Amino acid sequence: MGLDNTSWKESFKYFEVKKMKKALVCSVGVGSGIERPILLSIEIYSPELVVLAGTVASREKIEEVCAKCDEIEVVKSFFSNPDDLTKCYKESLKILEELKERGYNYKDIYLNITSGTKVMSAALSLAAVSRGCGSFCYVAGERDENGRVISGTERTLTLKPTTIFAERMLSEAKSYFDRYLYGACEVLCSEVRGLTEEKEIVEKAEFINKIN
């Protein structure tokens, strides 16, 4: 997987790291109208830089999105095999790690997995979770007879990877509690409260801590 006729270093050569705040990585497929969900997520997250991750087949769609992003730095990237989960996952990690090297914190990297193959979306999601990215989103809505989201009905569904980490920690805290390891349980419950603001998860952590 590589950038379009350039390297990551060349793409970012004249971009001032000190001004960077948020980056958005979008999977790009070949369907009709797929540019709208991508542009919607750009409007929502207001990133300084957008990575359009697609395939050779979706190059035309990528160019269509680029044409509408005049004031945003855009980097093009291509999956070598959009149906190979292992390769897509490794290439997704590479995108995130390159952004990290260029000054972005993982928590300031967001992903839109609406378009592209299911494998591409899954790979980007797994990469986002493994690196603790800010959040990843999916643009849903009412669909027409061809299965495409009808313009004007879009709604953005988001999930923060930190919520997944918090749920895992909460499960471990319960395990420690059941084994009378109260000190370890208390530490994990405190970490859970620092990871997420999800009311249900926080309340469970506080309850376990209270009876600990």
Residue ranges and their predicted role:
Residues 1-110, 122-212:
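Long, low-complexity, Lys/Arg-enriched
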Residues 113-115:
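Intrinsically disordered, low-complexity N-terminal tails
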